[in-house]
Design a protein with these regions (language model features):
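One-carbon transfer enzymes
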Residues: 1-174
Length: 174
């Protein structure tokens, strides 16, 4: 990947760390939103590599940051904010989603792992999709299905995290 890469996260950033190590390349810019200390535990490998934006960044703030790069590839890794329509239309943005929304549209939105577990689904998976104005509505570019029957919630999170990392590596290499 020769393009500038900007990665966003709201949680720990562990997915970005794993993807970067497997690719042998770090994003050109890693962004997270300000959150109260008790809600935040950033992966130690990201210390000093992260730029902070407001907890609920504005369209102007996001546009100013992304506008520093010509045609950046923007990836969302547990970014718990909705990108404004103008940003979705101006930049090429992709989101990793830990719910097999190709088969289970009810897994769109927040906490798809918990939803899959609570629904007692036999299968789930992960997708990478283009970010559009609608939440988890964009074109799906990668997906992988896995059996989750009988898994504990912690196992489910772990398996879907591993699948997501694998999908991102494949997507970003190609």
């Amino acid at each position: 990947m020769n393009r500038k890469w900007v990665a966003f996260f709201s949680q720990t950033g562990s997915e970005i760390v794993e993807v970067s190590k497997l690719l042998g390349r770090w994003p050109d810019l890693i962004i997270t939103n300000e959150r109260p200390e008790h809600l935040r535990k950033i992966h130690p490998a990201l210390e000093g590599k992260v730029a902070f934006v407001e907890n609920k960044p504005t369209e102007e703030e996001l546009g100013l940051i992304l506008g520093h790069y010509k045609d950046p590839l923007v990836t969302l890794h547990g970014w718990l904010r909705i990108m404004p329509p103008y940003i979705c239309n101006r930049f090429e943005i992709y989101n990793g989603h830990p719910g097999l929304i190709t088969e289970y549209p009810e897994l769109k939105g927040k906490d798809p792992q918990q939803k899959a577990f609570d629904l007692g689904l036999d299968f789930s998976g992960c997708v990478i999709h283009k970010v559009t104005e609608g939440v988890d509505e964009g074109e799906i570019l990668r997906s992988r299905k896995v059996s989750i029957k009988g898994l504990e919630i912690g196992e489910l999170f772990h398996i879907l995290h591993s699948i997501s990392v694998s999908l991102w590596v494949d997507f970003l290499k190609n």
